[in-house]
Amino acid sequence: MKNRLKVLRAERDWTQAKLAEELEVSRQTINAIEKGKFDPSLPLAFKAARLFAMTIEEIFEGD
């Protein structure tokens, strides 16, 4: 799954650790999602969408 997490995080000058803290997950989870090795759960995708004030579709895109 492609996603814009890394770009959105960089626009805010956030580290992976900061984003992980905001989403209440581990830094390793953020790393895996950004690299496309892990697809976020639906609750996590909703949480990210709320955090960035975007829709899930604007952040995550299926392959």
Annotate each PLM feature.
Residues 3-22:
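Short basic helix-loop element that most often maps to the first helix and adjoining turn
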Residues 11, 50, 60-63:
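Short, charged recognition helix plus adjacent turn
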Residues 18, 29, 58:
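Residues in the helix-turn-helix
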Residues 22, 33, 62:
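Residues in the recognition helix of alpha-helical DNA-binding motifs
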Residues 25-38:
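Recognition helix of helix-turn-helix/homeodomain-like DNA-binding domains
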Residues 43-58:
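DNA major-groove recognition helix of helix-turn-helix/homeodomain DNA-binding modules
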